[in-house]
Amino acid sequence: PQTVIMFYAVNLVGGIANMVHPLSSEKEIEFYLKESGSICALTLDQFYHKFEAVRQNVESLNNVIIASIKDELSKPIKVGYMLTEGRKIQKIPADAPIIRWKEFMQMGTRYRWKYKVHKEGKDPAVILYSGGTTGITKGILLSNLNFNALGQQIIATNLMFRPGDRMLAVMPMFHGFGLGVSIHSMLSQGGRCVLVPRFTPQSYAKLLLKHRCNFIAGVPTLYEALLRLPTMEGAD
């Protein structure tokens, strides 16, 4: 959820979100940061060392904010996570020049000055990157109008949609499909998103049935995997 929060927060204060694949190599991350002139980076603790390795090469980068999966988990699930996946993550040095996500959120509660910036439809909102199939990957600058038009068009052509409907969002948020269709189209029109942190057909089906999601957006292989699951037989 930190990605969703920061995406809208950056837009609110007049910034541009630069969406990067978290599994990118250090060289690729350095390119993305330099190409965009990013002044702040938000990443998970498990990817901290990639950013630390390139930080000195990116003059514009002033702050690195570190979030953790455990930040948003309930206490019982957090304990289980720390005993399994969490223990595999390399510890960040205590004196590392970073801002922890919880600390960052607390800093916001003490801020008393004006921070909202009025933006026009033509103003840039986000940078997404091409696949690089014909050469080096390219940053694609999209405007507020691009994203809002997408949201309105998707909902306008879907007569079944009602405010409060749920989307099971599994597509990555550094991808236009995931960020534009699964997230912004729903939230901007009064819908809700159920975030899927890590995809497996079994976990996806479980969340779909648990939350009784009204919509899903995915690629053909996702639907093929769901159709092969016994738990989806006759599911409503």
Task: Report residues per predicted region.
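Conserved AMP-binding/adenylation subdomain of ANL enzymes
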Residues: 148-166, 174-215, 224-225, 229-230
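Short hydrophobic alpha-helices that are characteristic scaffold elements of the AMP-binding
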Residues: 8-13, 34-35, 175, 187-188
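Conserved adenylate-forming
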Residues: 26, 34, 39, 46, ...
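Conserved S/T- and glycine-rich ATP-binding loop of Class I adenylate-forming
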Residues: 10, 41, 124, 130-133, ...
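Conserved AMP-binding/adenylate-forming
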Residues: 1-26, 170
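Conserved G/P- and acidic residue-centered "switch" motifs that form tight phosphate/ATP-binding loops
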Residues: 14, 133, 190
